[in-house]
């Protein structure tokens, strides 16, 4: 019953009918769509378009006929759907797995050769080793040559040729494969590390490379090298051989004097700008490594290759970025720093012109900021909205708002800038500039013996003038900086007759002043040289016509021109019976008083000396005839009648008055002069040579005539040399 109903129902007939439906295009097979099948089909389509078309596969065999008893649709649907999807999934997995391999192979094929950045040659990767510090690669030969060059030039630590990363020492060792060069690299690295230690001191012995790290040894500066066989003692402060009982400055001067090289112009061992060859050598101020630089006015900002110290080549001091903007006198380019005169003029100019300049800058900056800031803001906003697709109304609104805000804020910004900038500039001009100049010794301001402030200008570049000679005579100085001839030396002595001579100094850079006088300082000679510094010498010979002479040289040791020296006994030279020389200590006070000088040419000096000699002989004959027959032939020609010779020369102090040229009085009025409160020590008993205007009529008159023996010892002046001839000297 049930089976018949089932067979007669319309549903069962439609499912099991053998005749196909003419409206259905497929043969009755249905397929279920899923997300996996949709995306896998699209992926297969893309791969098919990108990959070259392969040969079509051979036609598959026709499917077997269906079984006679059809299975239900629900039971047969899953196998039908799995048949086409499984090969697609496997093909997709194979394509995904093969994709990265193909990409890596393509990339590997393009990176087979590496281009060296040094020689620009494409090489295989095995010839371009990888570095541990950075990813850059270069060929092995170029790296080896680069390392050799850097080590030989002591440029350690070594950086990558393409970047600033430092190379690993392990890479350097593998690339070099040279033990001696690697040892040199390690030594340079050690020296560079030790140079950064402020307490490290290297042994100054020439054959020793030992260093001593001395912590807290400033109070006990004596160090000893601990290397076996060296044991050199040296100083902690100056890093030189130990100098007992001497300061570092004194030892430095002594070393400079012993190492001084006498060239044609007698240029000493110094760091002067005018001395030395074109290739100048100076030590680093930190590690004392010698550095050579062409003296061609190139850049003066130097960097030590050993310790990395940045210093100025002109002043040899460690510097900062603002060193060449400070009033130190050092320039970024050039062969020498500013002179003292230029520093002082620059300082005075800044001190006087700073208020005017700062006011002018502030007056220009305030309107420029008030007007310029809104204009700048408006242009920036307009350029920002220019490339965008925005409405014109919105753009104009943004520009108007920005300009309005900038107009309100610009006066505030200008006021703050001027309020902060002006005090900073004033503090720099009136604080930093004078302090830096005076700290470096370049201000030239000093106190003049309690008489006020004196400004000293440096006149090193100009010729030596009479005023310079007179200043050197009045204010001799001996300092620790006299290595190159900075000392002005004043030496005086006496002789029986007054005379004037020309003597060329032993050094070409020295202006030598010489004079022969009878018991007084009678004259000076100005012989200018080519050098930068001058030395003042006044020499005299004390002698009898037939007896040997004794010379006294007195060195200036104080600013009051008071000289002390050990001289031979003047008494013995005047006493014919007592010819033994006895040493005595004398003190001569030199006081400047006005008289007259005149300039004569060097070619006429010898003639003028002969004329003065003839005049002196005539005066001597006239005085001898009028003075009586009380004297003998052996008595001194200028012996006073009322005293003995020994008492006259040995027991009395002589006051020597040196004349002052009238041509330089105006120049000396503005400079420091000698104190006028020094009492004159006169002799009422001893006779002294006086002029025609002297009070004592019995004293012989002398006008600078030398004795024949003294005239023979004088050096003849060179042609064209200007000589000072003294017309009148007054001795009290």
UniProtKB/Swiss-Prot annotation:
Which residues of the sequence carry a binding annotation for Zn(2+) 5? 312, 315, 323, 330
Give the region (Required for ubiquitin ligase activity and for protection against staurosporin-induced cell death) as residue ranges.
Answer: 1-315
In its UniProt record, which GO terms are filed under biological process?
adaptive immune response; natural killer cell mediated cytotoxicity; protein autoubiquitination
Protein's cellular compartments: Cytoplasmic granule membrane; Endoplasmic reticulum membrane
Instruction: Give binding positions for Zn(2+) 1.
Output: 116, 119, 139, 142
- This protein's source sits in the domain of life called Eukaryota
What EC number(s) would the UniProt record show?
2.3.2.31
Query: Where along the chain is the active site annotated?
Result: 299
Name the residue ranges with Acidic residues bias.
Answer: 100-109, 674-683
Question: Compositional bias (Pro residues) spans?
Answer: 54-71
SUPFAM superfamilies (alphabetical) = RING/U-box (SSF57850)
Instruction: Specify the inducers.
Output: By IFNG and LPS in macrophages. By IL2 in natural killer cells and cytotoxic T-cells.
Instruction: Give the CC-aspect GO terms.
Output: cytolytic granule; cytosol; endoplasmic reticulum; endoplasmic reticulum membrane
| Zinc finger intervals, RING-type | 116-165, 284-315
Q: Where is this region: Disordered?
A: 1-109, 598-644, 660-732
In the bilayer, the protein is annotated as: Multi-pass membrane protein
Q: Which InterPro entries match?
A: E3_UB_ligase_RBR, IBR_dom, TRIAD_supradom, Znf_RING, Znf_RING/FYVE/PHD
Q: What is known of its domains?
A: The first IBR-type zinc finger is the most crucial for interaction with UBE2L3, UBE2L6 and UCKL1. Members of the RBR family are atypical E3 ligases. They interact with the E2 conjugating enzyme UBE2L3 and function like HECT-type E3 enzymes: they bind E2s via the first RING domain, but require an obligate trans-thiolation step during the ubiquitin transfer, requiring a conserved cysteine residue in the second RING domain.
| Record-stated family | Belongs to the RBR family. RNF19 subfamily.
Q: What is this protein called?
A: E3 ubiquitin-protein ligase RNF19B
């Amino acid at each position: 019953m049930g089976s018949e109903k089932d067979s007669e129902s319309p549903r069962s007939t439609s499912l099991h009918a053998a005749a196909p439906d003419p409206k259905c295009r497929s043969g009755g097979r249905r397929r279920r769509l899923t997300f996996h099948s949709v995306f896998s089909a699209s992926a297969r389509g893309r791969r098919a378009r990108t990959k070259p078309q392969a040969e079509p596969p051979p036609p598959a065999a026709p499917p077997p006929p269906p079984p006679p008893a059809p299975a239900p649709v629900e039971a047969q649907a899953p196998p039908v759907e799995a048949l086409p999807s499984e090969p697609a999934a496997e093909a997709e997995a194979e394509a995904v797995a093969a994709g990265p391999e193909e990409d890596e192979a393509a990339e590997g094929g393009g990176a087979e050769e590496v281009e060296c950045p040094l020689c620009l040659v494409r090489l295989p990767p095995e010839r371009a080793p990888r570095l541990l510090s950075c990813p850059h690669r270069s060929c092995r030969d170029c790296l080896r040559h680069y390392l050799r060059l850097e080590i030989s030039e002591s440029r350690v630590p070594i950086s990558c040729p393409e970047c600033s990363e430092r190379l690993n020492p392990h890479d350097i060792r593998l690339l070099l494969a040279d033990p001696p060069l690697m040892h040199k690299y390690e030594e340079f690295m050690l020296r560079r590390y030790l140079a950064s230690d402020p307490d490290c001191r290297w042994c100054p012995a020439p054959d020793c490379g030992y260093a001593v790290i001395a912590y807290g040894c400033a109070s006990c500066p004596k160090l000893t090298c601990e290397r076996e066989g060296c044991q050199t003692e040296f100083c902690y402060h100056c890093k030189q051989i130990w100098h007992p009982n001497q300061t570092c400055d004194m030892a430095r001067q002594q070393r400079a004097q012993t190492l001084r090289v006498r060239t044609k112009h007698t240029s000493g061992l110094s760091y002067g700008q005018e001395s030395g060859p074109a290739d100048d050598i100076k030590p680093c101020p930190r590690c004392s490594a010698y550095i050579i630089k062409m003296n061609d006015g190139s850049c003066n900002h130097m960097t030590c290759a050993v310790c990395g110290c940045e210093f100025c080549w002109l002043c040899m001091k460690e510097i900062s970025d603002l060193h060449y903007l400070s009033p130190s006198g050092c320039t970024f380019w050039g062969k020498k720093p500013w002179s003292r005169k230029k520093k002082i003029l620059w300082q005075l100019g800044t001190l006087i012109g700073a208020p005017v300049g700062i006011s002018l800058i502030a007056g220009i900056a305030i309107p420029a900021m008030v007007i310029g800031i809104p204009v700048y803001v408006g242009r920036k906003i307009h350029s920002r909205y220019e490339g965008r697709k925005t409405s014109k109304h919105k753009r104009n609104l943004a520009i108007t708002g920005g300009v309005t805000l900038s107009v309100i804020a610009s006066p505030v910004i200008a006021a703050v800038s001027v309020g902060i900038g002006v005090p900073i500039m004033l503090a720099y001009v009136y604080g930093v500039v004078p302090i830096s100049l005076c700290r470096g010794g370049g201000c030239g301001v000093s106190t003049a013996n309690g008489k006020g402030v004196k400004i000293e200008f440096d006149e090193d570049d100009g010729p030596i003038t009479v005023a310079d000679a007179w200043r050197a005579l009045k204010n001799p100085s001996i300092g620790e900086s006299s290595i190159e001839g900075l000392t002005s030396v004043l030496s005086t002595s006496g002789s029986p007759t007054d005379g004037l001579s020309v003597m060329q100094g032993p050094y070409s850079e020295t202006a030598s002043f010489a004079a022969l006088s009878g018991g007084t300082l009678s004259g000076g000679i100005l012989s200018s040289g080519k050098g930068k510094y001058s030395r003042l010498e006044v020499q005299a010979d004390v002698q009898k016509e037939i007896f040997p002479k004794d010379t006294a040289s007195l060195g200036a040791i104080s600013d009051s021109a008071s000289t002390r020296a050990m001289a031979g006994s003047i008494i013995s030279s005047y006493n014919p019976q007592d010819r033994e020389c006895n040493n005595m200590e004398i003190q001569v006070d030199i006081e400047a008083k006005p008289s007259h000088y005149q300039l004569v040419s060097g070619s006429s000096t010898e003639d003028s000396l002969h004329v003065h000699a003839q005049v002196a002989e005539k005066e001597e004959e006239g005085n001898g005839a009028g003075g009586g027959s009380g004297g003998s032939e052996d008595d001194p020609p200028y012996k006073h009648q009322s005293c003995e010779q020994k008492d006259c020369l040995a027991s009395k102090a002589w006051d020597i008055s040196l004349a002052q040229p009238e041509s330089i009085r105006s120049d000396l009025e503005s400079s420091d002069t000698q104190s006028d409160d020094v009492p004159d020590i006169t002799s009422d008993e001893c006779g002294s040579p006086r002029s025609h205007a002297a009070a004592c009529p019995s004293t012989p008159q002398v006008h600078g005539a030398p004795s024949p023996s003294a005239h023979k010892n004088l050096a003849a002046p060179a042609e064209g040399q200007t000589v000072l001839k003294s017309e009148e000297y007054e001795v009290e």
